[in-house]
Amino acid sequence: MLESAQIRAARALLGWRQQDLSKASGVGTATIRRIEKSDWAMTGYVSTMVRIQAAFEEAGIQFIDDDENGGYGLRLAKKKRKR
């Protein structure tokens, strides 16, 4: 499940405002604001989190899970080069 810090970081990496994420995901701006205020794992509807994650992934964000090698995070995928 996404962490609120990952959502804020993904928006920053893309240069998105909360309104941009709302438009891309179909999730209301007030809901995004509430989710981002949380300090821990998200406690919202699963469908809401799936829509947010899908919008970021469509924009090129790759989420990294917490594991034995390190904490959670994210990165921006490389753009495919035309040959």
Predicted regions and their residues:
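Short basic helix-loop element that most often maps to the first helix and adjoining turn
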Residues: 7-20, 81
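Helix-turn-helix/homeodomain-like alpha-helical modules used for DNA recognition
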Residues: 61-83
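Recognition helix of helix-turn-helix/homeodomain-like DNA-binding domains
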Residues: 27-44
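Residues in the recognition helix of alpha-helical DNA-binding motifs
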Residues: 10, 24, 35
